[in-house]
Amino acid sequence: MNDSDRIKEKNENEILRRNFTKGSVKTILSISLLEHLCSTDLLAAKDKYTAKKWLHAVHEIGLGVKETKISQIQWQKQVEELFQNKIELNELLKLINFDQIEKSAKFVDNGARSIRPKLPRSNGYPKSLVFGSQVFALKKGRSVVPHGHNNMATAFIVLKGNFHGRHYDRISDEKDHMIIRPSIDDKFGPGQTSSISDEKDNVHWFKAEDEPAFIFNIHVLGLPNKKGPPRRTGRLYIDPEGEKLDNGLIRAPFIDSKKAHQKYG
């Protein structure tokens, strides 16, 4: 090989090395960008629903559980996915006209103020909804007091503020008591959600840790009771600081709304 050929080969190798380096850098940058998009949820944003699509989806799973096409636990899993992962919190706030709710909210010194939002019913939105809805407005230290539910499936999402949230599984009922077991004890901030049904996490209690604090709630009523004789749909107030039993169980006495708010409101 003469000097001319050696120089030519050296130049070709240098070009190949540079092209390989450029390709490697591009690949690394592409991978890094993809990792960044995933870590910042920019790709996940494509999976978010519009407010209209989201409301239809919540209505449809509500029909599903009402008509026993899906179980109550399946409804809980699906509704929590819709609340926490399928709509931006800002979109939900716009949907319920939260700015107006917050401006006009009249807080109470005990318990929570219940406000009924007006959801759209025209322009492609569901004309009627299988679920009811409300916003709870609370001062710091006030609570959605401990209570269980009959024939209901409900879901919550924190709109503003921070809460200490507790749930209990309803194991059985006695004449004057409900046997419960703690299932959730956690902090809940904006965008975080939980749910209840006759089958799972039936009792809940949320205490505001700052103010103003707001929770959005939906509820599907009149679900069939599969655990015993027919019972009236509604709330059942209890005192979760009842007698401690074996295996983490608590014998919680039934109390009325007044006593519940006196102690926990």
Predicted features, each with a name:
Residues 155-157, 210-223:
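A short hydrophobic beta-strand segment most commonly corresponding to one strand
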Residues 134-149, 198-201:
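Conserved short histidine dyad/triad with adjacent acidic residue
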Residues 172-201:
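Short acidic-glycine-tyrosine-enriched beta hairpin
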Residues 14-19, 30-50:
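N-terminal twin-arginine translocation
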